[in-house]
UniProtKB/Swiss-Prot annotation:
Listed name of the protein: Protein-methionine-sulfoxide reductase heme-binding subunit MsrQ
Keyword Membrane: yes
One GO process term, biological-process aspect: protein repair
Primary location: membrane
Higher taxonomy: Bacteria, Pseudomonadati, Pseudomonadota, Gammaproteobacteria, Enterobacterales
Length: 199
């Protein structure tokens, strides 16, 4: 049974809740002392992991729609991508304001250059910014064929973002490895598409 347009609307409402609820949990954890002795790192990692989850969910939509024969499912992809950008922006903001501090924002540029994992992170964020700004149908019409070329940059983000996470942790744990493995699986599902680019 295929999803109807009305069901997709309700699914989008649910996905908006999924995107917003982690923010409520984070506020609750901050106010109730639910974070560790290093709350700044907790906030950075939580926002970064949530952004990664939405990135992976965005990449999952196309193969899921194809294999499940649910073409209307594609309509949720933009929404997931927007939430990915929201959480990536919260991740960047938490680093800039909580790690560096508002009085040291001038150091942000030098930090991004001197620390390679931060360089990967800001490249990923800038790519997501470009994708977000051009995610409308108006932008798609204006850019024409170039729109798809630009939005293929999401595959670069799918590589850089997990590497950024792996590189940022001082002690390697299973979590960043799992995210990287999931990203590789989702990219592998597009093997035929990548081969066509070479032709």
């Amino acid at each position: 049974m295929r999803l109807t347009a009305k069901q997709i609307i309700w699914l989008k409402v649910c996905l908006h809740l999924v995107g917003f609820l982690p923010l409520l949990w984070l506020f609750w954890a901050i106010n109730q002392g639910g974070l560790s002795a290093d709350p700044v790192k907790d906030i950075q990692h939580f926002t970064g992991r949530t952004a990664l989850k939405f990135l992976l969910a965005t990449l999952l939509i196309s193969p899921l729609a194809r294999y499940a024969k649910q073409p209307l499912l594609i309509r949720t992809r933009r929404l997931l991508g927007l939430w990915c950008f929201v959480w990536a922006t919260l991740h960047l903001t938490s680093y800039a304001l909580l790690e560096l501090g508002i009085h040291n924002l001038a150091l942000l540029g030098s930090e991004l250059i001197s620390r390679p994992y931060l360089t990967l992170g800001i490249i990923s964020w800038l790519a997501l910014l470009a994708l977000t700004l051009t995610s409308t149908q108006f932008a798609q019409r204006k850019l024409g064929k170039r729109w798809q070329t630009l939005h293929n940059v999401v595959y670069l983000v799918a590589i850089l973002a997990p590497v950024h996470y792996l590189w940022s942790v001082k002690v390697l744990s299973p979590q960043p490895v799992i995210y990287a493995a999931l990203a590789l699986v989702l990219l592998a599902l597009r093997y035929r598409k990548f081969r066509q680019w070479r032709r």
